[in-house]
């Protein structure tokens, strides 16, 4: 049956709220399975281990180990486990084994807000 002339779709699409832009995602994210991931910008070969900056893209971490044979990756996981007060086995390198841009996955069930807070406290200690 053809539509009547001048008929409008009253009531349809009226309940839709205007789309709000999503808040910027920080370096700490939760994947669909519930695991927590941290985007890391590693700086190997530094004098000492330190969280140098927390931006919306990544957490900058200076690592006091050379970037050879995975030494810096192992030291990064060890240092983050100490900072986040987790077991070493709960901090695993997920992506970026040969890159400065890395993703570290946390196997412990810790809220992302708490993780971000602990990382920001380390930046303030500098």
Swiss-Prot record:
Superkingdom of this protein's organism: Eukaryota
SMART domains membership: DUF167 (SM01152)
Region (Disordered): 1-33
SUPFAM superfamilies recorded: YggU-like
Modified residues (Phosphoserine): 89
InterPro entries linked: DUF167, YggU-like_sf
GO cellular component: cytoplasm
Stored Gene3D superfamilies: YggU-like (3.30.1200.10)
Record keywords: Phosphoprotein
HAMAP family in alphabetical order: UPF0235
Protein family: Belongs to the UPF0235 family.
Annotated protein name in UniProt: UPF0235 protein C15orf40 homolog
